Amino acid sequence: MRLSQMLFVTLREDPAEAEIPSHKLLLRAGYIRRIGSGVYAYLPLMWRVLGKVSQIVRQEMNAAGAQECLLPQIQPAELWQESGRWDTYTKAEGIMFALTDRQDRQLGLGPTHEEVITTIARDLIRTYRQLPQNLYQIQTKFRDEIRPRFGLMRGREFIMKDAYSFDADVESLRVAYGKMHQAYCNILQRCGLKYRAVDADSGAIGGSGSQEFMVLADAGEDEVLYTEDGRYAANVEKAISLPVDAEPSGLTKFEKRETPGTDTIDKLCQFLKCSPTQVVKNVLYQAVYDNGQTVLVLVSIRGDQEVNEVKLQNELVKLAGKFGGKTVLALTVPDAEMQSKWASQSLPLGYIAPDLADSYIAATKDIHPQFVRLVDQTAVDLKNFVTGANESGYHVVGANWAEAKGKKTKAKSGEFALPDGVVDVRKARPGDRALHNPEQTLKTARGIEIGHIFQLGTKYSQAMGATYTNEQGEEVPLVMGCYGIGVSRLAQAAVEQSYDKDGIIWPVAIAPYQAIVVIPNLNETTQVEAATQLYQDLNAAGIETLLDDRNERAGVKFKDADLIGIPYRIVTGRSLAQGKVEVVQRASRSSTEIALDQVIPTLKEWIAAACPS
């Protein structure tokens, strides 16, 4: 392609809307154009990148035995109501675009396709002889993000590959899951990206286990915790670890103490001269279930730890049936306005004890009259701990848990009934010890999630009646997995991982073009002729090449070549007199003079080395 004929416009300044380097560079380099909030046009250079990423994805999926198809983007609400996810996606997470057609039928624009594919499997898969199956598509998805930002990282429409496997049993699912895991590793390696596969929370998709694939980048939205031995890595939302050991408490006598102005752990520990590991703090949450029921949750956790709200929400979803719901729509620390709707009296915030009386909850419609009491594992084994006294300005010291779990009254003075709900809701953090080897400590890195694979099990097949007849003649649910990778997100993540002050540094495998021939001076006939011949020969040899034949100064052309990130820049300049051209490698900035007849074999060698197969 000749740049003089391409719709090619670059910007010298960073657009005001862009926050992270990759977003700025894709806009400046003319790869994308903003059309609306979270909505972008893919311009010709970007479309070539997306085509290359899609082709690598397609090749690896096909190699793993998956079959390509295309599913409808408009989905009937009834399918999502069958699976129980309509309210979750239109109310709780609220990420589905919902619409009503002229017959007043509710529809959704597909953010994902579990319901559609399960319906197809229900209709077409009858017997174990048809298993296993794995279907995938590469398609535009839609999600109504609350705050679209970062360009293609969090947009309202994006290109995604989603695959769905159907197996006879859990063992076969694990085989399919393993194949997809390897396919994703192959995709990322072939795209030239540094990444980690990490344990992850399954969220609204559900299932028994999942992994995210994180492209490592300083601006990544996600925090990854990992061990240097390579045996553990997890998203911080899912990560588990061993906290530091609690220090033994010297406050062995139970008593109530006046502790004015100590409504934070730091202030309390300074006042009492104790370690935060000797404190049980009690954090109040407000959960709203999908049936409108509001539940107040009191979480007791060791004073040096923080609550992981993703883990907490998962625990509360498990309890949903107790309150007549299916899922949690909202989980918050209630502010003064929220408290005013249910609190019968002023709460002793900062001084709450594990036994805060249920009478603090006023008799109110749709408010559960009792606190849900949970205790994190970090607090269970504490002895002689410090905690609130349910009175502002006071704490108790030397407290213990009663031996009888779930006891409704204190066994004796100074003891608190241990809640029935003993859970792991603490946030793992860097420096914690690893479970698999306490000598290993967790390190931290930032990552961009570009892929997520799930072992769904029978969540959808049971809900939607997708069954098959097994070898024993029994009708049993299909066992499912689902596997997503963001094609457009991966492309921007590659930029976020690899750029410099001058522009993008594309991995060779997914660069829009592999080489660009630059004519410094259009008035020099020898430069124009040599460049044109090279351009034709390179393309004929299978090396995708641009020709910068614009009537611009050489400096402008060089800056644009750096900005758009083409891996190899070939300049027909002064060295032509010696039968050579200058070849600059974008990644290393190294410059080499190469004889004209050696340009093609040299570039072929470099490209082969840079593109793992």
UniProtKB/Swiss-Prot annotation:
EC number: 6.1.1.15
Keywords on record: Aminoacyl-tRNA synthetase, ATP-binding, Cytoplasm, Ligase, Nucleotide-binding, Protein biosynthesis
Presence of keyword Transmembrane: no
Compartments, as annotated in UniProt: Cytoplasm
Keyword Cell wall biogenesis/degradation recorded: no
Assembly and oligomerization: Homodimer.
Main function: Catalyzes the attachment of proline to tRNA(Pro) in a two-step reaction: proline is first activated by ATP to form Pro-AMP and then transferred to the acceptor end of tRNA(Pro). As ProRS can inadvertently accommodate and process non-cognate amino acids such as alanine and cysteine, to avoid such errors it has two additional distinct editing activities against alanine. One activity is designated as 'pretransfer' editing and involves the tRNA(Pro)-independent hydrolysis of activated Ala-AMP.
NCBIfam families given in the database record: PRK09194.1 (NF006625), proS_fam_II (TIGR00409)
Protein name: Proline--tRNA ligase
